[in-house]
Amino acid sequence: MQYEVVLPAAGSGKRMGAGQNKLFLKLLKKPILIHTLEVFQQDPFCTGIWLAVKPEERIYIQELLDEYRITKVKGLPNGGAERQHSVHSCMKEMEQVDIVLVHDAARPFITHAIIANLVQSAHDFGAAIAGVRAKDTMKKVRNGVIEETVDRDSLWMIQTPQAFRFDLIVEAEDVAEKVGFLGTDEAMLVERLGHTVHIVESSYENVKMTTQEDLLFGEAILRKRALQLNE
């Protein structure tokens, strides 16, 4: 089932402390951004990629796209101050498609199998997001003091991609913009419309590159996958 994907790529990545867009940092000699883009470039069901970028980084990103032969990118609109604004910027330029995915550009380890499950779920139910079950004991804390232990069985750690029927995510984005609501993710905008969002079990490897420690973990994942391919 075909889809297009939006990748907000205009963030600052302050927690990485790299002094540059973290998406340009390399994992095994290749930029994080390219690792992520190649997942969708190589997926035959992906018909288009939209990258929201900083204007001052557009030329460099285009050079990367050319160097690594990423041909599915349909647009590089300006990113906004927040992720939600960047996604909305891309949505305004898209023509109608069946399914739209929104994915963190700093999550390069998503698999085609998980993507396919998300697209199917979004087709069936309208909205679906990737997530994994919480593994650690969870505590509710206020002012440095534990208030209660939360039931872990009902808790999921949410990832991306998040997948939606086109008309649903457009409506959710438009309503949020009109009332000035800023959500933490696209699913939250859809939830505000009263629409049910389904969850698709993902992988603990689908980590977001946020800190220097994540880079070490990311390189370990790449090496493990390379070994599996050669077995």
UniProtKB/Swiss-Prot annotation:
Q: Where is this site: Positions MEP for the nucleophilic attack?
A: R152, K208
The chemistry this enzyme catalyses reads: 2-C-methyl-D-erythritol 4-phosphate + CTP + H(+) = 4-CDP-2-C-methyl-D-erythritol + diphosphate
SUPFAM superfamilies reported for this sequence? Nucleotide-diphospho-sugar transferases
Q: Which UniProt keywords apply?
A: Isoprene biosynthesis, Nucleotidyltransferase, Transferase
Positions marked as site (Transition state stabilizer): R15, K22
A GO term for molecular function: 2-C-methyl-D-erythritol 4-phosphate cytidylyltransferase activity
Q: Name one Pfam family in it.
A: IspD
Q: Give EC number(s), comma-separated.
A: 2.7.7.60
Q: Per its UniProt record, what Gene3D superfamilies does this chain match?
A: Spore Coat Polysaccharide Biosynthesis Protein SpsA, Chain A
Report the record's Gene Ontology biological process terms: isopentenyl diphosphate biosynthetic process, methylerythritol 4-phosphate pathway
To which pathway does this protein belong?
A: Isoprenoid biosynthesis; isopentenyl diphosphate biosynthesis via DXP pathway; isopentenyl diphosphate from 1-deoxy-D-xylulose 5-phosphate: step 2/6
Transmembrane stretches, start-end: none
Q: Say if the entry is tagged with keyword tRNA processing.
A: no
Sum up the protein's function in the record's words. Catalyzes the formation of 4-diphosphocytidyl-2-C-methyl-D-erythritol from CTP and 2-C-methyl-D-erythritol 4-phosphate (MEP).
The UniProt entry's sequence similarity note says:
Belongs to the IspD/TarI cytidylyltransferase family. IspD subfamily.
Q: Matching NCBIfam families, A to Z?
A: ispD (TIGR00453)
Q: Output this protein's name.
A: 2-C-methyl-D-erythritol 4-phosphate cytidylyltransferase
